[in-house]
């Protein structure tokens, strides 16, 4: 069945009648015994569906159950991006070792072959990614599954867009071993800011250390491309300025990365200018909080207007809420901010100015 699939794929490969591929096969004695089969395949131009490549070159051999691709290169006919691959497959040990470097449109190629989207539909590449990837895989009996897999590499790309929001470039280093992954030196650039940091996933636990100065629209666009249902601001909150966000800590995805999702410990720092809450405008807002399991500890929430400010500290421990509130805003603004949480009795007339300090549980 697998051979039939391979032959089916090969049958789709076309070339011009005037420039057919050239194949040279050499048979020789192998020093270890048996026969060594060498193959040299060259093609000026090949086409597979929508994929068109030129300068195709493959040089390899087979001996003692080992397939060796010494040189495997090609260029994309439209972008001139290249692919360079070296590969060794040991059929006895069921191992595969590879090293690939590419500036070709690999994502478009893969979609053309498997007919499936490999990146969120909200993301569009405006330039081709550059990829370097090496790795080793050990397969189970009959090559039915992978027993061990490790890979490492780096990737970068120029301009791309998410939900129409244009980014300048992105890059990172990455590695993977049997379900555990590491993404380091993550750097995403936007005309209005950047997103940088590292993410590590080990045994169902994801450790995060990221810093963002991306504009709000760009940040929400990235989040929506990953989790569209969750990435939205509360209706009462409007952010017109560009925020700065720092997140450090860990979350648990469960054994086998199958959930349930749970926050272990996260530290969050955020600041923003020109923000509205319940229609009340603030010049700036800053917050610092820590999430531990289901509890939340807010060590700073500072909302600043030209005519006053609000400070809040508090903790939510699952069932208990402890807080301290200080404000010199006009009482009518506090009533607006409270929304449905609090209403002033009709017979009570609010003063024009007041200083408020509240501590409660």
Stretches found by the model and what they are:
Residues 1-68, 79-181, 193-297, 304, ...:
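Membrane-proximal interfacial segments on either side of biological membranes
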Residues 186, 299-301:
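Tandem-repeat architecture and repeat-register "anchor" residues
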